[in-house]
From Swiss-Prot:
Gene Ontology CC terms: nucleolus; preribosome, small subunit precursor
Species of origin: Pongo abelii (Sumatran orangutan)
UniProt entry tagged with the keyword Hydrolase: no
Protein name stated in the entry: Pre-rRNA-processing protein TSR1 homolog
Annotated segments matching region Disordered: 1-67
Listed GO MF terms: GTP binding; GTPase activity; U3 snoRNA binding
Composition skew (Basic and acidic residues), residue ranges: 46-55
Purpose: Required during maturation of the 40S ribosomal subunit in the nucleolus.
Length: 805
């Protein structure tokens, strides 16, 4: 009898799983004291219904709208400072006096003329619009005046030409202003009514299309008639303001009147009285004051004279004669400052910030073993006394000629000459080659010259500086060599490599190998200040500025600042027409430290810029001269030095300079031989960090002489046996990606046996990387000479391809 077998449709009962339904005690034991996340109720989580969400959104919109309206009412109103407008013509055909005359509308309000040197300025009071404007002007070629006045202007009014918009000078001015940071701006066209009616529409269309590249989605206004000027004033009054971060957290002031009281001891130094309206933040007398272009100073007291331009003057009846609506302010500035004088605040010596910018180093407490300048000078004198060496020279050689004969025992120079020493052989070769080429070219020009030469060529040649052209050609060649063979140097034959590169070290990995940022610091690091945590200090200072109530002059007050120990040259510059602008410094901003700035090469400039070359910096509200180091902008703890400012990537410029809290814009200029400042790079301030390590790399190269399976004999990297043994622990690499080490030296001429992780090719090159930390030079100079008005150069700075080979 067959056994019964279950079919496929037999019922399968679910197995009992005892671990699923646990009791409370077992769950607590398994949780080991951990508590589950409690779900919040709808009321506790403050979840709003759809109606409440709409109501809340409408309230937020209303608050933002009220904040914008309050800002508009305060700027130019009776309780705020005048609305400062900077008028900048962007083309040489624009008539600036005509535009300023149109803005002085007699029907709109009262006009107070104020002549500040060469700059035209006036105050316009309009009780009907409840607004007052302060108009100033600047030519686009006057670089310092435009940039300084744009720092404090509430609105910039750009005047455009109806046919071209702006010329080369105006385009250069716009590039600088965009890099520094633009406040609120308005575009106006002057002269379009002078065109025929048929061409006016076409001109406006072409101009709008051309302006879209710089100012997308911006409306063009007209400025040819009095009615159009009135519409422009309404636009300026109702326009939403754009803020600049670096000035909103500081108190600043544009000087309307200046007086100087010489000191009894020294006539060249005295007390400077600056009168103007406080802007930005509350001005405290115990803070330091930075006068743009002149330095940092202390304040004695702040006076509060009466407002010379009230929006609604009391006790003055309106004039019946409409011609009397224009009132010319011809009173003395000193009388304005002393009228209705009231002392607002005096400096407290216990709370006033010090002008100390550097730490006075104590040589007895330093832990660094770096030699001082006196020890270096003594060592040089000792070497000079003991450097009498007997040399074999040809017969008839004088002692002076014998000094030029190279000897194998000469040592390398100091650290400051390492850039020159690294590329000495390349430079000597290039100089000889350039001299030979220049002499051949001169002979060829002399042989082929004819009497019928063009006069235009002679005039063109007179503008060319041959020495400057030769230096520029040499720089182009060095930059080209650096691009083709980055960081490669030739091992000197007259100096032992272990002596020449004694300050360098090898690293197994540039990214992960440790490097102590506090070792072998230079003597200049004893003079600077460093924060324990720069980010936290910056946040706490900004929070104090925004939340804490500061005692002093409120925003919108007309005040007179008594600034002590000011040189008389500041007043002379003001009387010559240079605007005087003062910024209140935040704590620690007068102290020296190491600033790191992220910069990118300006596309309009192609001249090579070498590291440690003197440049002019516009950093926030400061400008100064310094010699920066360029390094790669990476997230690692070590950053490779770049010998040139490259155009294809952003780099970090490192300099010694006074502390500035970011955000702050950075502009780099280079002064030409004719005194003109050329824009090199633009960027922003990244950090104030002396511990940021800039590492210089040198690459020694060798040639494989004999190749085996994984072994090779390499020559030309070193030239004696001792150097091979000295650099034996350093890892080797090749351009084709092989890795290896030195096994042993062969002979006494620098040949060495090396092992690699693969077979070498005959066309491969063996390389050795050596690293050394470098520091910027202390070349900080707060004095920057006034630039010559900018003009586009007629001579192209490009180098022909034949000269680069």
């Amino acid at each position: 009898m067959a056994a019964h077998r279950p079919g496929t449709l037999k019922q399968q009962n679910k197995a009992h799983k005892g671990g699923r339904h646990r009791g409370r005690g077992s769950a607590q034991r398994d949780g080991k004291g951990r508590l589950a996340l409690k779900t919040l109720s709808k009321k506790v989580r403050k979840e709003l219904s759809r109606v409440d969400q709409r109501h809340r959104a409408s309230q937020l919109r209303k608050q933002k709208k009220e904040a914008v309206l309050a800002e508009k009412r305060q700027l130019g109103g009776k309780d705020g400072p005048p609305h400062q407008v900077l008028v900048v013509p962007l083309h040489s055909r624009i008539s600036l006096p005509e535009a300023m005359q149109l803005l002085q509308d007699r029907d709109t309000g009262t006009v107070h003329l104020n002549e500040l040197g060469n700059t035209q300025s006036f105050m316009l009071l309009c009780p009907r619009l409840k607004h007052r404007w302060f108009f100033t002007s600047a030519r686009p070629g006057d670089l310092h005046i435009v940039l300084d006045m744009a720092k404090v202007a509430d609105t910039i009014l750009f005047l455009l030409d109806p046919l071209e918009g702006w010329d080369s000078t105006g385009d250069y001015c716009l590039s600088c202003l965009f890099a520094q940071g633009l406040p609120t701006y308005t575009l106006a066209v002057q002269g379009i009514s002078g065109l025929p009616l048929k061409k006016q529409i076409d001109a406006r269309k072409k101009l709008s299309k051309a302006v879209e590249k710089r100012f997308p989605h911006d409306k063009l206004l007209l400025l040819d008639t009095q009615q159009e000027a009135g519409m422009l004033l309404r636009q300026l009054a109702n326009q939403k303001q754009q803020h600049l971060a670096f000035r909103d957290r500081r108190a600043y002031l544009f000087a309307r009147a200046v007086d100087f009281v010489a000191s009894e001891e020294n006539n060249l130094v005295g007390t400077l009285k600056i009168s103007g309206y406080v802007r930005g933040q509350t001005l405290n007398v115990n803070r330091l004051l930075h006068i743009v272009g002149h330095g940092d100073f202390q304040m004695k007291q702040i006076d509060a004279p009466g407002d010379p331009f009230p929006l609604n003057p009391r006790g003055i009846k309106p004039q019946k004669d409409p011609d009397m609506a224009m009132e010319i302010c011809a009173t003395d500035t000193v009388d304005d400052m002393e009228e209705g004088l009231k002392v607002l605040m005096k400096a407290d010596p216990d709370r006033q910030e010090s002008l100390q910018a550097e730490v006075i180093p104590d040589p007895m407490e330093g832990e660094q073993t770096w030699p001082t300048e006196e020890e270096l000078s003594e060592a040089k004198d000792f070497l000079k006394e003991s450097s009498k060496v007997v040399k074999k020279v040809p017969k008839g050689t004088s002692s002076y000629q014998a000094e030029w004969i190279l000897d194998g025992g000469s040592q390398s120079g100091g650290e400051g000459d390492e850039y020159e020493y690294d590329d000495m052989e390349h430079e000597d070769f290039m100089e000889e080659e350039s001299q030979d080429e220049s002499s051949e070219e001169e002979e060829e020009e002399y042989e082929t010259m004819t009497i019928g030469e063009s006069v235009h060529d002679d005039l063109y040649d007179k503008k060319i500086d041959e020495e400057a052209e030769a230096k520029m050609l040499e720089k182009y060649k060095q930059e080209r060599l650096e691009e083709m063979f980055p960081d490669e140097v030739d091992t000197p034959r007259d100096v032992a490599a272990r002596i020449r590169f004694q300050k360098y070290r090898g690293l197994k990995s540039f990214r992960t190998s440790p490097w102590d940022p506090k070792e072998n610091l230079p003597q200049d690091y004893a003079r600077i200040f460093q924060f324990q945590n720069f980010t936290n200090t910056r946040k706490s200072i900004f929070k104090e500025v925004e939340e804490k109530e500061v005692e002093g002059a409120e925003v919108g007050c007309y005040v007179t600042l008594h600034v002590s120990e000011v040189p008389v040259s500041v007043v002379e510059c003001f009387r010559q027409g240079t605007p005087l602008i003062a910024f209140s410094l935040l704590p620690h901003e007068q102290k020296m430290s190491v600033l790191n700035m992220v910069v990118r090469r300006d596309p309009g400039n192609t001249e090579p810029v070498k590291a440690k070359e003197e440049l002019i910096f516009h950093c926030g509200f400061r400008r100064f001269r310094a010699s920066p180091l360029f390094s790669q902008h990476t997230a690692a703890d070590k950053h490779k030095l770049q010998r040139f400012l490259t155009a294809d990537m952003a780099l970090v410029a490192t300099v010694y300079a006074p502390i500035t809290f970011p955000p702050a814009s950075v502009l780099l200029f280079k002064q030409k031989s004719n005194g003109m400042h050329s824009l090199i790079a633009t960027g922003h301030l990244m950090s104030v960090d002396p511990d940021r390590m800039v590492i210089k790399r040198v690459v020694l190269s060798g040639h494989p002489l004999k190749m085996f399976t994984k072994m090779a004999v390499v020559r030309y990297m070193f030239f004696n046996r001792e150097d091979v043994l000295w650099f034996k622990p350093v890892e080797l690499r090749t351009k084709w990606g092989r890795r290896g080490h030195i096994k042993e030296p062969l002979g006494t001429h620098g040949h060495m046996k090396c092992s690699f992780n693969g077979k070498l090719k005959s066309q491969d090159t063996v390389l050795m990387n050596l690293y050394k930390r470098v520091f910027p030079k202390w070349t900080y100079d707060p004095y920057v000479p006034e630039p010559v008005p900018w003009l586009k150069s007629e001579i192209s700075s490009t180098v022909p391809q034949g000269g680069m080979e």
